[in-house]
C-alpha cells in the first residue's frame, strides 16, 4: 500500500523574532525543513506535499524539484493546513504521514516504525506520542480505562485533570488518506484558539467507532518542536551530540566532543584526530589519519589523508594528502594545496594552486597564483595581484626560490629554478635558471649619523 506525506511549513514563527521563515532556520548546517524532509524520505512516500505560506518562495526553493507544494494563504490552524493538501492527495488509497516542518530531531527510523505500527494495527489514525517530564504547552493524549486513545486536548483547552497527563502529542500522525480528508470536512473552530485543529479528527474517528492508536517515541528528544531561539539552541545541541557520537563510533577521535561543531553532511574518515573547538561546516570531507588542532575552522573543503591543520581557517578549497597548514593560516576560496605542501603561520592563500612539496613558512600572501612544485617562499613575500579594477595572475614554475620580502607584481612569470633576491620588487618576467634582483644598491654615508639628534654626540 502506498505512503504519502504532508509537511507543514506555512507558519511564520513569530516567537523566533526573525524575518526568516521558521522552518528555514538551520540546525547543524541544513534547514529544519531539510532535516524533516530527509527523515520523511526514509518511508519512501509515493508523493510528498509541502504546505507553504509565509514567504512561500523562500521555502519552496529549499525543496524545489523534490516535493509538490500547496499554499496556505491564511494560517488558520493545523487542520486548515492539511486541508490545503487535499487537491494533491484526494482519492488516493494508502497512508498519509502528517508532520510539522519545525521538528528537526525526528528520525527516519522512528517514522518508519510509526508507519509499520499503524499498518500492522489496522488503525484509521495513529498518533506519534512521547512521555514528557514537563508536558506544559503540549497537547495531551487522553485514553480510556482500556488504554485506548479517545482524544487529544490542547493545553489551552485542557481541564485540571487533563493537564496532569504526561503523554503528549508530538504533532506527527499517520492517517488513512481518504478518511483523513473526509473527517476534515467535519471539524470547526469552536476552541480557545479559534482555529481548525487537526487533532479534532481523532475525536471524529472515535465517535464513529474507528480504531485510533498511539505509537510512543523511545527518545523524547525527537519530539522537540522549535518555536523560539532557545529551542533552536537545544536542537543544535542534541544534533551535535548525535553527529559526534556517530563519528566516534566510526573511528574518529574527539578530544572534547562537547566543544566540537560538525555539520550533518560532513564526512570524516577513520583515525582522524579532532581537538577541541574545531568547526567543520557544509560539505567538508576529511581524509584518514589527519589531525585538526584546536581552533581549526573548515568550510566546504576537502582535506586529504595524513594532513595536519593547526588552528587555521580553510574555505571552499582542497588540501591534498600529507600537507600541513598553520598555525594561524587562512586558505581562502578556490585554492588547491597539492600533496606535501607546507603553509605556515600567518600565511594567506586565495584562488591559487600550490604545487607538490612547496613551502610558504610564514608571513606570506599568495593570491591568484599558479605555483609549481618544490618552490620555497621566504618570509614576507607578497603577490601583488590587484590594481583596483582587475585581478592578475602570478605564475611560478618548479623549484623556484622566492627570497624573503619579495614583492611579485602581477601579471608575472617566474621560470624553473629561478631565484628572486631578498627585498626585491619584481615587475618583469624572470627566465628559468635566472636570479632577479629588483632593489636599489645600498649606499653608506660615513659619519652622517653624527648630525642626527639621537647620536650621543648631540646629547647634552
From Swiss-Prot:
Binds 1 Mg(2+) ion per subunit. Its EC number is 2.7.7.23, 2.3.1.157. Pathway: Nucleotide-sugar biosynthesis; UDP-N-acetyl-alpha-D-glucosamine biosynthesis; N-acetyl-alpha-D-glucosamine 1-phosphate from alpha-D-glucosamine 6-phosphate (route II): step 2/2; Nucleotide-sugar biosynthesis; UDP-N-acetyl-alpha-D-glucosamine biosynthesis; UDP-N-acetyl-alpha-D-glucosamine from N-acetyl-alpha-D-glucosamine 1-phosphate: step 1/1; Bacterial outer membrane biogenesis; LPS lipid A biosynthesis. It comes from the Bacteria. Keywords: Acyltransferase, Cell shape, Cell wall biogenesis/degradation, Cytoplasm, Magnesium, Metal-binding, Multifunctional enzyme, Nucleotidyltransferase, Peptidoglycan synthesis, Repeat, Transferase. Residues 1-229 are annotated as: Pyrophosphorylase. Disulfide bonds: none annotated. It catalyses: alpha-D-glucosamine 1-phosphate + acetyl-CoA = N-acetyl-alpha-D-glucosamine 1-phosphate + CoA + H(+); N-acetyl-alpha-D-glucosamine 1-phosphate + UTP + H(+) = UDP-N-acetyl-alpha-D-glucosamine + diphosphate. Acetyl-CoA binds at residues 379, 385-386, 404, 422, 439. UDP-N-acetyl-alpha-D-glucosamine binds at residues 8-11, 22, 72, 77-78, 139, 154, 169, 227, 332, 350, 365, 376. SUPFAM superfamilies: Nucleotide-diphospho-sugar transferases, Trimeric LpxA-like enzymes. One of its GO terms (cellular component) is cytoplasm. Gene3D superfamilies: Hexapeptide repeat proteins, Spore Coat Polysaccharide Biosynthesis Protein SpsA, Chain A. The keyword rRNA-binding does not apply. Residues 251-460 are annotated as: N-acetyltransferase. It is found in: Cytoplasm. The keyword Cell wall biogenesis/degradation applies. Its main location: cytoplasm. In the N-terminal section; belongs to the N-acetylglucosamine-1-phosphate uridyltransferase family. Catalyzes the last two sequential reactions in the de novo biosynthetic pathway for UDP-N-acetylglucosamine (UDP-GlcNAc). The C-terminal domain catalyzes the transfer of acetyl group from acetyl coenzyme A to glucosamine-1-phosphate (GlcN-1-P) to produce N-acetylglucosamine-1-phosphate (GlcNAc-1-P), which is converted into UDP-GlcNAc by the transfer of uridine 5-monophosphate (from uridine 5-triphosphate), a reaction catalyzed by the N-terminal domain. NCBIfam families: glmU, PRK14354.1. HAMAP family: GlmU. Homotrimer. This is Bifunctional protein GlmU. It comes from Streptococcus thermophilus (strain ATCC BAA-250 / LMG 18311).
